[in-house]
Amino acid sequence: MRVVAAAMLYFYIVVLAICSVGIQGIDYPSVSFNLDGAKSATYRDFLSNLRKTVATGTYEVNGLPVLRRESEVQVKSRFVLVPLTNYNGNTVTLAVDVTNLYVVAFSGNANSYFFKDATEVQKSNLFVGTKQNTLSFTGNYDNLETAANTRRESIELGPSPLDGAITSLYHGDSVARSLLVVIQMVSEAARFRYIEQEVRRSLQQATSFTPNALMLSMENNWSSMSLEIQQAGNNVSPFFGTVQLLNYDHTHRLVDNFEELYKITGIAILLFRCSSPSNDNAIRMPLDLAGEDNKYNDGETCTLRTSFTRNIVGRDGLCVDVRNGYDTDGTPLQLWPCGTQRNQRWTFDSDDTIRSMGKCMTANGLNNGSNIVIFNCSTAAENAIKWEVPIDGSIINPSSGLVMTAPRAASRTILLLEDNIYAASQGWTVTNNVKPIVASIVGYKEMCLQSNGENNGVWMEDCEATSLQQQWALYGDRTIRVNSTRGLCVTTNGYNSKDLIIILKCQGLPSQRWFFNSDGAIVNPKSRHVMDVRASNVSLREIIIFPATGNPNQQWVTQVLPS
């Protein structure tokens, strides 16, 4: 009898456990956000935690986590729950898929709602203790906008719209329109720091905003961005196709490199598109993106192709040019105003050569001070025609370890191989977009970096859209310049921790070269220190270089300004 009783007790416990799982569903991780008392920093931390949670077990490309593909994720780890609470205490819980950051369902007030194309995995494991309802539309933007009878550009975002959206979803009202609010303020903001920054500003100022053309084009092209980044490979900036964004005025902007894409969008996380080729420095050559944006090569290695062609922008915004357009062996390379002429068009091949007019960029010797010329690819020494182009903006001859350098900032300056001191005179960008990006630089407490004249420090002030002192020109030589006086550069006054950052005349120095890291830091490559609001105290009016900590006083976002 004891054996039978024990068996019955075991059966009861097992059934109870099974029933409990059936009622409760899987205990998925949860990342919550409460509007009541929320500040900009609260929202920042919420998105940071959400990114970390969905990125568990991922690898990185250019410092950005690549979300896992469906085949790599067990059901018990497939979703993250995101409870959102409004000012009245109503809570709606979103279910977010860790493979793509999509909102796949939500619950509130003992009800749950699934899109009409919901999978059995979603319905069997999410909100199973609620009354499950199926919506008449899917979760893509076209369907949501049709169901809402409005477009995203007409829907306000910010604390008040989020408050109203939570109320509506809690009661099952205006579902499509409300989802358009929460999806952009949660999923899209997790994908793009630009969108995060827009929401943070609205929280700080208690205002609302509508998405602009640039923001909407980001949302529509996350998949193609992810593909271009993964196909280029780790530690590589140039893309092999382009990402088509829109400017604020709805004109097209074709982005062809990671550095520019990051400065414009602040992309923070990648959709898995294909397995990147293993590489550190070498440029890889993939196929152009074809088909609609949401189709991807799940599980396939990125396909390679032979070449792509770009300008090379360097010191003072001048381009690498074959002198006088001559294709004679030994013709030197020089700086010259950027254009579309064939002697400024450089083809990057999969054999690590860089070619113009059918000839190879060639080191005329492998010693410090050797000049760089074009030469017949078949007869030049092989170690003189090989180049690496890492993401930091150097162009390196790997045999010598020397880098391409522009010793003067003037047209007709002959380019040389020199020791790599991470100078601005050694910074380059491979792109067809030869003009500098003009942007504000937003940092600690949503304040803007401000210039205060030559030989003076920079510091933080409240952002003002019309302030010329807060407008910066981001050059291809990796300098940050005062937009109204482009001969002045952001400069670290030394390379030691706590050295001040000031404004000096641009001289191509290592102290004037900066790298916008994908973790939000702005790095001086020479010192390896980052731009830092001293002691997290804006009233000190001191910006310094300091070892990287990842703290908020070292986090920066560029906000591109209308041209």
From Swiss-Prot:
Listed Pfam families: Ricin_B_lectin, RIP
Chain positions of 2-gamma repeats: 527-554
CDD domains: beta-trefoil_Ricin_ebulin-like_rpt1 (cd23483), beta-trefoil_Ricin_ebulin-like_rpt2 (cd23490)
Domain Ricin B-type lectin, residue spans: 305-431, 434-559
UniProt superkingdom: Eukaryota
2-beta repeats: from-to residues: 486-524
SUPFAM superfamilies, per the entry: Ribosome inactivating proteins (RIP), Ricin B-like lectins
UniProt xrefs under InterPro entries: Ribosome-inact_prot_sf (IPR036041), Ribosome_inactivat_1/2 (IPR017989), Ribosome_inactivat_prot (IPR001574), Ribosome_inactivat_prot_CS (IPR017988), Ribosome_inactivat_prot_sub1 (IPR016138), Ribosome_inactivat_prot_sub2 (IPR016139), Ricin_B-like_lectins (IPR035992), Ricin_B_lectin (IPR000772)
UniProt record, GO biological process: defense response; negative regulation of translation
2-alpha repeat locations: 445-482
Reaction(s) the record says it catalyses: Endohydrolysis of the N-glycosidic bond at one specific adenosine on the 28S rRNA
Glycosylated position list: 221, 368, 376, 483, 537
EC number: 3.2.2.22
Signal peptide bounds: 1-25
Residues at the catalytic site: 188
UniProt keyword list: Disulfide bond, Glycoprotein, Hydrolase, Lectin, Plant defense, Protein synthesis inhibitor, Repeat, Signal, Toxin
Disulphide-bonded residues: 274-302, 319-338, 360-377, 448-463, 489-506
Intervals holding 1-alpha repeats: 316-356
Any one GO molecular-function label of the UniProt entry: carbohydrate binding
1-beta repeats: 357-397
Quaternary structure note: Disulfide-linked dimer of A and B chains.
Family: In the N-terminal section; belongs to the ribosome-inactivating protein family. Type 2 RIP subfamily.
Known role: Non-toxic type 2 RIP which strongly inhibits mammalian protein synthesis but does not affect plant nor bacterial protein synthesis. The A chain is responsible for inhibiting protein synthesis through the catalytic inactivation of 60S ribosomal subunits by removing adenine from position 4,324 of 28S rRNA.
Protein name: Nigrin b
Native source organism of the sequence: Sambucus nigra (European elder)
